[in-house]
């Protein structure tokens, strides 16, 4: 389970060095929901790969439940295949991470020494998340070294979304409390939201409270005030990951632990000048072009959404899903379904733990430029195995709550670089699939 930027880095290395390697990316959105049935359904995708069949494995399981994660890790260890873990130090695996500790330390020292801050709060992401805990440790350790008392070095946890910033400010100001001199945030989403909420309460940033972020997203650079942040080139993580695997394949012994050093960017939100690196007219042009493209795609998606809602069978649902994928910048796709979905009887439920491989069939695909329905699965597997070097196939679960109903496969999904709404699209498909499935079960029960 790896992010778009990391997979982009992997593919870039493969192409730069002419490696005869392709990538199969098994992905889940387990962290998108707290519903245990949904999370279980998402995790089934990781039962699919036979890890021993691969030459190298890249691991990013930071958002998985501990028991589910350990099950996957145990299978990877048993495979004997070299594995590189991203942003989580796992015993027996190579490890690459962002050196967030150093960047947070620099923020704290800068706020203390250059801006005279003496009270601090860390608005953090999920408790237990490895990267977040590293940043919390850097925050607390540095303040301890500076002699800042514990009551002036507080921490709150949330997720990596904007609500965490909003809630942190509300938490600090409830019952007449005042904001500290500085709020150090786990990422830019949190930082921007913290600034907005502080300003609603009458605080000025940076005059009354200073704020820092992390990641250097566009919102950080374009926001007013410009957010002090740390730039992370996540493509470099994927690139370095591929380099480690290539060294292993060539009989070399790379270092077990590697770090990507983020670049600290001081901006207006901590009281420093605008760094002057943004061409605002260029950014505005990009936003205008993007909004026009988004409008076209939104119209197409709305039409497909209506078809999804009106679909009366799973095959109609598949066709509507194919209409959606046809609008996206990719080289092909396949929708694999358990045939029992459409032939449901009360005694014939879908699997909840892994896939019934003998029941999977290709309900629809476009892998060779032509849309087709109901083709043998072996052709899809051959397409993946015989794909040119540098090809990426993204695979994620088609599930109905906890039931393993099938698999989506996207070939070279370039649209992911510019669009981050794939989850919303898939969630729509899964919601309609759940409705169809409930109707079938009701019909089977009545019969």
Description of each model-found segment:
Residues 423-435:
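Allosteric cytosolic regulatory segments
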Residues 1-307, 311, 315, 323-326:
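Bacterial carbohydrate/catabolite-sensing allosteric modules
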Residues 407-417:
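Short beta-strand-to-loop transition segments that serve as allosteric relay/switch motifs
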């Amino acid at each position: 389970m790896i992010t778009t930027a990391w997979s982009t880095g992997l593919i870039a290395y493969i192409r730069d060095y002419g490696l005869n390697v392709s990538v199969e990316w098994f992905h889940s959105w387990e962290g998108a929901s707290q519903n245990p049935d949904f999370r279980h359904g998402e995790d089934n995708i990781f039962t699919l790969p036979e890890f021993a069949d691969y030459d190298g494995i890249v691991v990013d399981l930071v958002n998985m439940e501990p028991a589910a994660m350990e099950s996957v890790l145990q299978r990877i260890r048993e495979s004997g295949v070299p594995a590189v873990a991203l942003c989580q130090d796992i015993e027996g695996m190579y490890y690459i991470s962002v050196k967030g500790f150093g960047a947070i330390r620099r923020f704290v020292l800068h706020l203390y020494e250059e801006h005279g801050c003496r009270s601090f709060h860390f608005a953090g992401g999920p408790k237990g998340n490895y990267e977040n805990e590293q940043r919390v440790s850097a925050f607390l350790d540095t303040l301890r070294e500076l002699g800042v008392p514990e009551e002036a070095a507080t921490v709150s946890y949330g997720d990596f979304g904007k609500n965490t910033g909003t809630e942190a400010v509300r938490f600090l100001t409830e019952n007449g409390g005042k904001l500290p001199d500085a709020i150090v945030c786990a990422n830019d989403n949190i930082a921007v939201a913290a600034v907005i909420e502080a300003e609603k309460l009458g605080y000025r940033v940076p005059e009354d409270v200073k704020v820092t972020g992390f990641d250097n997203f566009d919102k950080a650079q374009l926001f007013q005030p410009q957010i002090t942040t740390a730039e992370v080139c996540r493509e470099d993580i994927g690139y370095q990951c591929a380099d480690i695997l290539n060294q292993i394949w060539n009989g070399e012994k790379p270092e077990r632990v590697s770090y990507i050093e983020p670049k600290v960017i001081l901006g207006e939100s901590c009281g420093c000048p605008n760094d002057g690196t943004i061409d605002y007219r260029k950014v505005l042009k990009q936003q205008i072009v993007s909004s026009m493209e988004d409008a076209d795609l939104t119209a197409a998606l709305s039409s497909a959404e209506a078809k999804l809602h009106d679909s009366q069978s799973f095959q109609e649902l598949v066709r509507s899903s194919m209409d959606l994928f046809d609008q996206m910048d990719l080289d092909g796709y396949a929708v694999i379904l358990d045939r029992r979905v459409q032939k449901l009887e009360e005694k014939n439920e879908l699997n909840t733990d892994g896939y019934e491989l003998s029941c999977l069939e290709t309900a629809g695909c476009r892998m060779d430029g032509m849309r087709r329905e109901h083709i043998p699965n072996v052709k899809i597997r051959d397409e993946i195995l015989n794909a040119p070097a540098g090809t990426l196939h993204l695979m994620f679960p088609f599930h109905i709550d906890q039931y393993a109903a099938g698999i989506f496969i996207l070939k070279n999904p370039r649209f992911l670089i510019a669009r981050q709404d794939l989850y919303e699209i898939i969630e729509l498909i899964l919601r309609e699939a759940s409705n169809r499935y409930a109707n079938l079960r009701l019909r089977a029960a009545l019969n």
